[in-house]
Swiss-Prot record:
Component of the tagatose-1,6-bisphosphate aldolase GatYZ that is required for full activity and stability of the Y subunit. Could have a chaperone-like function for the proper and stable folding of GatY. When expressed alone, GatZ does not show any aldolase activity. Is involved in the catabolism of galactitol. This is D-tagatose-1,6-bisphosphate aldolase subunit GatZ. It comes from Escherichia coli O8 (strain IAI1). GO terms for cellular component: plasma membrane. Pathway: Carbohydrate metabolism; D-tagatose 6-phosphate degradation; D-glyceraldehyde 3-phosphate and glycerone phosphate from D-tagatose 6-phosphate: step 2/2. It comes from the Bacteria. Belongs to the GatZ/KbaZ family. GatZ subfamily. The keyword 4Fe-4S does not apply. NCBIfam families: agaZ_gatZ, PRK15052.1. GO terms for biological process: D-tagatose 6-phosphate catabolic process; galactitol metabolic process; phosphoenolpyruvate-dependent sugar phosphotransferase system. Keywords: Galactitol metabolism. Gene3D superfamilies: Aldolase class I, putative tagatose 6-phosphate kinase domain like.
Length: 420
């Protein structure tokens, strides 16, 4: 990460896409997409997804590292080209506890990530805990971030410190996505970004972390990009020029969250304006979802009724029976909630792919389709971009490859924006 940031600060148009997903097919696609390039791939886990207690994936940081490395070995992607990152590392998961208890767990969280070899650490102590004022004072946020940084430094080896990098700041939506419709978004003021940097510098120095400050590579701000269930707020470069100019006088770049669904031109403009780390998550699993839904429609037409997976019906039934991952995000009417379950850009389906019933139904569908020849006309109907690539010889009509290529479409846009 440090080399990439140095190249960007030296004037190169270079950025990196941060893949924020624990889905094995998304990780496989991210690694396979860059297998034949010289680029490194940044894969991040969030604190609620992966933590010392397992998170909602059931994985500790060490488990997640091995999970990613196993996929890399299968794909033929060199492990040393993978950068592992931890996102929103702080009290996010324990906000209902008092600050002392939440920070104690947060310290162990950060240590677990660093011990597992994660080298990009987002120190995010912005969340109010039980008994805290809302919002927290910037000084309190910075002081808690310094506590987390001290924890990271205390377990990092000398070799790890050479690679270790920190991201500070948190002008981002609640991890997991927006819970309501959005009409506009607040772009970070330069004064607020400067204050974030100033308070963190002061807090780090007070804790004897002057050297660690040299490892702070980025600050999270809001450049004016966001999405909800059916709306996308697109990047308007002219609105972020003050931010773009301010960061040029520092050693850092910006990290932009929720960049999903922007245009490839927007990604290029974001990187040009020094938002050099572009986070993406739901757009990748949304592309996966589109591919699986398309293949399910093809299965419906090609496979005898008694042998079909019933994949779409299984997904719907499981999500209606177990609504904990979407209930507070989606609309309440039955028809509206069904539309959101299927097609929301927030893509809450991503939390359900590991469910045994859904996983088994998708596997059945894949086996069914691997045993038949899919007419090109059907691929054109349901996966038109992939049809064009089949016609040009770039792609084969194998179900797994069709899913991969659908995810590649998202990665292609980021590659354009981050291109060296």
């Amino acid at each position: 990460m440090k080399t990439l940031i140095a190249r960007h600060k030296a004037g190169e148009h270079i950025g990196i896409c941060s893949v924020c997903s624990a889905h094995p097919l998304v990780i496989e696609a991210a690694l396979a997409f860059d297998r034949n390039s010289t680029r490194k791939v940044l894969i991040e886990a969030t604190s609620n997804q992966v933590n010392q207690f397992g998170g909602y994936t059931g994985m500790t940081p060490a488990d997640f590292r091995e999970f990613v490395f196993t996929i890399a070995d299968k794909v033929g992607f060199a492990r040393e080209r993978i950068i592992l990152g931890g996102d929103h590392l702080g009290p996010n998961c324990w906000q209902q506890e008092n600050a002392d208890a939440a920070m104690e767990k947060s310290v162990e969280l950060v240590k677990a990530y660093v011990r597992a070899g994660f080298s990009k650490i987002h120190l995010d102590a912005s969340m109010s805990c039980a008994g805290d004022p809302i919002p927290l004072a910037p000084e309190t946020v910075a002081e808690r971030a310094a506590v987390l940084c001290f924890a990271a430094e205390s377990v990092a080896t000398d070799c790890q410190r050479e690679q270790l990098s920190y991201v500070i700041g948190t002008e981002v939506p609640v991890p997991g996505g927006e819970a309501s419709a959005i009409q506009s978004v607040h772009i970070t003021h330069v004064e607020d970004a400067a204050n974030t940097l100033r308070t963190h510098q002061k807090a780090f120095i007070a804790r004897g972390l002057t050297e660690a400050l040299t490892r702070v590579i980025a600050i999270v701000v809001q450049p004016g990009v966001e999405f909800d269930h059916s709306n996308i707020i697109h990047y308007q470069p002219q609105e972020a020029q003050a931010l773009a100019q301010w960061i040029e006088n520092t050693r850092m770049v910006y990290e932009a969250h929720s960049t999903d669904y922007q245009t490839r031109t927007a990604y290029w403009e974001l990187v040009r304006d020094h938002f050099a780390i572009l986070k993406v998550g739901p757009a990748l699993t949304f592309a996966l979802r589109e591919a699986i839904f398309a293949l399910a429609q093809i299965e419906q037409e090609l496979i005898a009724p008694e042998n079909r997976s019933g994949c779409l019906a299984v997904i719907e039934e499981v999500m209606l029976d177990e609504p904990q991952y979407w209930k507070k995000y989606y609309r309440t009417g039955f028809n509206d909630s069904l539309l959101d379950i299927r097609y929301s850009l927030s893509d809450r389906i991503r939390y359900y792919w590991p469910h045994s019933r859904i996983k088994n139904s998708v596997e059945t569908m894949m086996v069914n389709l691997e045993g038949v020849d899919t007419p090109l006309g059907m691929i054109s109907q349901y996966l038109p971009k992939q049809f064009e690539r089949i016609q040009s010889g770039e792609l084969s009509a194998i179900p797994h490859q069709l899913i991969m290529d659908k995810i590649y479409d998202v990665l292609r846009a980021y590659r354009y924006g981050c291109a060296e």
